[in-house]
Amino acid sequence: MANIDNKGQTELDQQDMEDVEDVEEEETGEDANSKARQLTAQMMQNPQVLAALQERLDDLVGTPTGYIESLPKVVKRRVNALKNLQVKCAQIEAKFYEEVHELERKYAALYQPLFDKRSDIINATYEPTEEECEWKVEEEDISGDLKEKAKLEEEKKDEEKEDPKGIPEFWLTVFKNVDLLSDMLQEHDEPILKHLKDIKVKFSDAGQPMSFTLEFYFEPNEFFTNEVLTKTYKMRSEPDESDPFSFDGPEIMGCTGCLIDWKKGKNVTLKTIKKKQKHKGRGTVRTVTKTVPNDSFFNFFTPPEVPENGELDDDAEAILTADFEIGHFLRERIIPRSVLYFTGEAIEDDDDDYDEEGEEADDEEGEEEADEDNDPDYEPKKGQNPAECKQQ
């Protein structure tokens, strides 16, 4: 009987050992998966690994898929026919944009009388009538007596103030309200831009290569003698023969500024610095005066020159890319809608667009937080408590 019990106990012990081994193997597998995840997370935080991965992905961009390569020759011929059709589509699209440019020229002439009147009001050469000044404002429902009282108080305040002419510092305010432009402004630019009277856009004549010119009109001032500063952008609306599929509308090919005739000691694009130099042998010290470039909005009128071969260094290319963006923004947004940038209403519209994107981003963050709650292997970043991660 004892032998039977011992035998049964031995069988049970062996079974228990097998169960234990299975559990240990399972736990070992889980540990391996956890370590693999941790290793992957560490690798993805390594800038060198990310750079190598990005370089590999960049190499794959434009690489034909295996499916395309495996197509029969007769099918590849038909794909080539589709590509030729795509090139013809790009050529038609180029003509479309040329006609759009002609329409812009036509309607610019219709807008100009309104822009001229805007300039007259800003610069106090025309005083708008009562009818022209009426503007429907959304107001809360208040009694007529309160409205009349508020109107009288406002008129009394206006009488106490000195009567300004036109709309002072109109364009300077516009520039300061727009991040793209305010980033270019320096403190020493502001006194000059207070003299800016108007900005106009002129399109190239019919039959001429596509271009547009920005004209900045200044009242007489103590900084330079120019009445008008100009910046011309040359455009092209035709597919590149070497890469026709990259065509996506007109592109700016280059720009030319103008020479600013600065008055003596008023050139804000240059600054004078003094450096002390010590003679190695005699030990004497001398002061050297040197003129160097200075940050200023007015560098906008002296863009880098594009060499004939079209090759630019990285700094010049970055400057021109930003320059083209600014020129396009002035033409498309600032000049047609300047009053709305002056009041900030156009900026609020732009912010609303970004808010929508922000809400989407918030939703994505919420999803990530949910994943963190459900993921037992989630580990917070170094220097951050798990509680802090969930509270953010």
Curated annotation (Swiss-Prot):
It is found in: Cytoplasm; Nucleus. Phosphorylated by cyclin B-cdc2 kinase complexes. Keywords: Cytoplasm, Developmental protein, Differentiation, Nucleus, Phosphoprotein, Spermatogenesis, Transcription, Transcription regulation. The keyword Metal-binding does not apply. Its main location: cytoplasm. GO terms for biological process: nucleosome assembly; positive regulation of transcription by RNA polymerase II; primitive hemopoiesis; spermatogenesis. A motif (NAP1L motif) lies at residues 126-150. GO terms for cellular component: chromatin; cytoplasm; nucleus. Residues 1-37, 346-392 are annotated as: Disordered. Initially expressed throughout the embryo with expression higher at the animal pole. Becomes localized to presumptive ectoderm by gastrula stages. By stage 18 (neurula), expressed in the neural plate and posterior to the cement gland. In late neurula/early tailbud stages, expressed in the neural crest, neural tube, eyes, tailbud and ventral blood islands. Adult expression is predominantly in ovaries. Pfam families: NAP. The keyword Ribonucleoprotein does not apply. Residues 13-30, 346-377 have a biased composition (Acidic residues). Acts as a chaperone for the linker histone to facilitate deposition of histone B4 onto linker DNA. Required for both remodeling of sperm chromatin into nucleosomes, and linker histone binding to nucleosome core dimers. Plays a role in tissue-specific gene regulation. Required for primitive hemopoiesis, acting upstream of tal1/scl. Belongs to the nucleosome assembly protein (NAP) family. Forms homomultimers. Interacts with histone B4. Interacts with the B-type cyclins ccnb1 and ccnb2. The NAP1L motif is required for the histone chaperone activity. This is Nucleosome assembly protein 1-like 1-A. It comes from Xenopus laevis (African clawed frog). The gene is nap1l1-a.
